[in-house]
Each structure stands twice: as structure tokens, then as C-alpha cells.
Amino acid sequence: MQQQIIKELHVSQMVEPKEEIRKRVTFLKNYLKHSGAKGYVLGLSGGQDSTLAGKLAQMAIDELNEEEQDTSYVFIAVRLPYGVQKDEADAQDAIAFIKPSRSITVNIKDAVDASTKSFEQATGEVLSDFNKGNTKARERMKAQYDVGAHYGCLVIGTDHAAEAITGFFTKHGDGACDVAPLFGLTKRQGKSLLKELGAPTHLYTKAPTADLEDDRPGLPDEEALGLTYEQLDDYLEGKQVHDAIRKKIESRYLATEHKRQLPVTIFDSWWK
């Protein structure tokens, strides 16, 4: 099953950072021109994935604007805090590194709290902290699509191979996007691209966190997954991993297949 998953997720055992950067920037340029859109939108958290996706997007925009003098493409970085983000300084460091065409902030707290209150008034029950976390992720994506629709831009997602294999994203939240420039990269490969790009070291060495749950703020991804990114990357790059780890990864992959598919129809058989 390991080789099948590697193939399905388009993972290469090794990447050359300069070549990979060029390939993905070119992809973003070509798809934007094909789409007829005016630019890209991305929610920027200050973590590794959005920093990398944002830098690639801004590089694509800068090159397009230099090559096509009669157009003016934009990359809009969107800050999406729930109240006050504890690592806001990292987000600002990411913005300083990327130098987006434009940066705006949409605080999602009022919208999320209103949605939570409406649910609880309608059902008479308390929305779990975990489900409220998913509401945050979906509200963030909704806000990005609002910005994208208003300015005629496409929404960028940050899904990569280590998230895809585990389904470690919110369905119709951070899993929703128009274009996914990091797809096929492992976590360590993403780090190598950021190193090549000269990103501030702390943006890709800090512990990754979705930071969605109020009861467990800053919960590290690896703790939530019960797997380390090193284990996931080793598996995805075709290396041998402990049998118990392999089984855990493959079990999670199968259990989250619905997240990697379009809504199931009567004509689909992948679930059988």
C-alpha cells in the first residue's frame, strides 16, 4: 500500500529545492493566466505551510507583473485571527518575508461565536470545542472566498503530502481551495524550499499547530495526530518505518479517504 499512496499523492523521494520552487511558481503563473483571475488570496498564519505558499504566490505575481506590463496582478495575504493570536509576531514576520501586494485582517471571532450561539440556541446543546475548532477553520476559508470573490482572485490552499495522507485538515475548511501549490511535498521538503528562499528560521522550525481548540490552545499537530512529521515523511519518501507506525498511517489514510474525494455519488465505488 505504501507505494500506491506515494503514487496517488505524487510524492518524490527527493527534491531539488531550486527546481521545485521554479516548477511551482511557474504552475501558479500559468494557472492564474488560464483562469482569467486577477490574483491570489491566502490566509497567512505565520506557520511553515502558509509562509511557503505565500512566498511562492508573491513570486508568481511579481514575475507576471514584470512580464505583462498591461496587467496588474495581486497577491492578498489575509490574517484570520480568532480574537488575539498568541504568535502574531510570527505572522508579521511571515508578512515581512513575503512582502505581499496587500495584507488585510479579518477577525473571525464574532462570526464564529455567533455561529456557535445559533447552534446552541437551535439545539439546546453545547457545541463541542473540537467542532467549534472546525467552525473556525471553515469561517477562515469563507472569509478568504469573500475576499477572493470581491477582488476577482483565486484562493490558495496549503495542503501538502503529510497532511493529505492523514486527512489532517477540516473538510470544507482549510481543505477547500482553488489551487494547492504545495501538493506532493513532504513536511521536510517544504522546509528545504523555505531554507532555499531565505525564510526566517523560526517560521519553519517551530512546532506546527492548527491552534483550533480553545480547551487545548496551541496543540501541536504531532500530538493531535499521534504521529510525527518525521515518521510521515519517511513513509511518504519510501523509507522503511516501524510496522506499528506503518499500520497507523495506512489506517488513518483509509479512514480519511472521503476528505480527498468529491462528494460521493451513486456512481462512485471508492468507498466500497
UniProtKB/Swiss-Prot annotation:
Binding positions (deamido-NAD(+)): 138, 171, 178, 258-259
Sorted UniProt keywords: ATP-binding, Ligase, Magnesium, Metal-binding, NAD, Nucleotide-binding
Lineage: superkingdom: Bacteria
An example Gene Ontology molecular-function term: metal ion binding
GO biological process: NAD biosynthetic process
InterPro entries in the cross-refs: NAD/GMP_synthase, NAD_synthase, NH(3)-dep_NAD(+)_synth, Rossmann-like_a/b/a_fold
Catalytic activity field: deamido-NAD(+) + NH4(+) + ATP = AMP + diphosphate + NAD(+) + H(+)
Biochemical pathway: Cofactor biosynthesis; NAD(+) biosynthesis; NAD(+) from deamido-NAD(+) (ammonia route): step 1/1
Similarity comment text for this entry: Belongs to the NAD synthetase family.
Purpose: Catalyzes the ATP-dependent amidation of deamido-NAD to form NAD. Uses ammonia as a nitrogen source.
Protein name as annotated: NH(3)-dependent NAD(+) synthetase
Species whose genome carries this gene: Halalkalibacterium halodurans (strain ATCC BAA-125 / DSM 18197 / FERM 7344 / JCM 9153 / C-125) (Bacillus halodurans)
Taxonomic classification: Bacteria, Bacillati, Bacillota, Bacilli, Bacillales
